[in-house]
Amino acid sequence: MHPLELLYQLEMSVTKPNRIALLIDCDNVSHNAIEGVLDELAKYGTVNVRHAHGDWNSPSLSGWIDRLHPHAIRPMQQFAYTKGKNATDAAMIIDAMDLLYSGNVDAFALMTSDSDFTPLVLRILESGLPVYGFGQRKTPKPFVDACSPFVYIENLLPLEDSKPCVSVIRENKGRNELRGDAALVRLLRTAVDQTSEDDGWAHLSRVGQYISNNSSFSAINYGYKKLGDLVRATELFDIEMRNDGKAMYIKDARK
């Protein structure tokens, strides 16, 4: 085994799971996606803080009420003090800052489609913590780009709850469509180039970490649950499975 590979595996084995704080803007996202969001966050760590913000006297949040207890989500009441003003945003920001200063979380997840939270994301990032974003496809680009990654919740909805147009979005994008996405191809090739060893091979986990640190990319938005599956679909990289098939290495097929 290559010394660098052994060191990387040792680092991964002693790394503690992330403690994630999930804050939900119930006014701006569908309750139907919460199961998918929690499943996705399980890839990154343990969601030990789950706060759902909104005015729970509002009939529009009735769907969320049924999701609270089954998923151990704590409702955070915020009354609408002034008609036409959304007090939930301010309360959610205060909640996030309290959690940030507590030092008891390692990452944040924001479930919202409101770009007003972009400054909050940037502030959390300044403290060295990642922010996982979840929102609708209408979410403004500044918020999407600030998160790493950002997942469109339409891709996380149960199939039986999805609209016909959503089911199309969730289909895996094929080889030609993926290759036609210049931004995606550039991102993948750059990530491999920046994380590869002298022989050109890069550990997929390191590639994924580079992408996470430099973009809002998520394989789910392309119809794939895992980065490795998307990489295979592009057919742009040579692939080697090492350590009895447990470690995936990729190399730019042009080299």
For each feature predicted by the language model, list its residue ranges.
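Solvent-exposed alpha-helical segments within well-ordered globular domains of core cellular machineries
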Residues: 35-39, 66, 70, 94, ...
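N-terminal regulatory modules in eukaryotic regulatory proteins
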Residues: 137, 162, 166-255
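Intrinsically disordered, low-complexity linkers and terminal tails enriched in Pro/Gly
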Residues: 2-17, 156-180
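Acidic beta-strand-to-loop metal/phosphate-binding motif
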Residues: 53, 106-113, 120, 124, ...
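Intrinsically disordered, low-complexity glycine/proline-rich and charged
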Residues: 122-162, 237-248
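Helical mechanochemical/support elements of P-loop NTPase systems and associated helical scaffolds
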Residues: 22, 30-33, 60-64, 88-92, ...
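Short, ordered loop/turn segments at secondary-structure junctions
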Residues: 26, 80-81, 113, 136-137, ...
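Domain-level signal for Mg2+-assisted phosphodiester chemistry and nucleotide/NA-binding surfaces
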Residues: 2-95, 100-101, 130
